[in-house]
Amino acid sequence: MKVTKISAITIFVKNMKDSCMFYSSIPKFEISYGGPDSNFTTFKISQSPDMYLNIESLSSKRKIENTCRIIFHTEDVDALYYYLRNDDIISNLGKFETKPRDADWGERYFQMYDPDGYEIVFATPID
């Protein structure tokens, strides 16, 4: 028996509207449940295999620790980087940490942060 995929990741956000705008601006991230006026929103990222990102409104009693890194594989990391850099919503609400670069572990990747400071990595395996 083995784990074969990540089905969903849930992160807690301070502002659901900003987070919905941010994640909706990433190509192929589609809201399948909830939305900007909801306390819980699910984005369907992939159908084969099914993969989801959940964002949940942070209650005033809970503190964000920003201890999560989300790594998404993409078909073309460079094209996605330039697309996101030129997207007004992503550029205004997110923060880019690196440009695309090759890593020793066999991926080309870039890092950025979402509106709540969660680290997001987009990567493409290097052939």
Segments (PLM) and residue ranges:
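Short glycine-enriched loop/turn motifs at secondary-structure junctions
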Residues: 2-5, 62-67, 103-104
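Short strand-connecting beta-turns/loops that link adjacent beta-strands
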Residues: 16, 36-37, 47-48, 105, ...
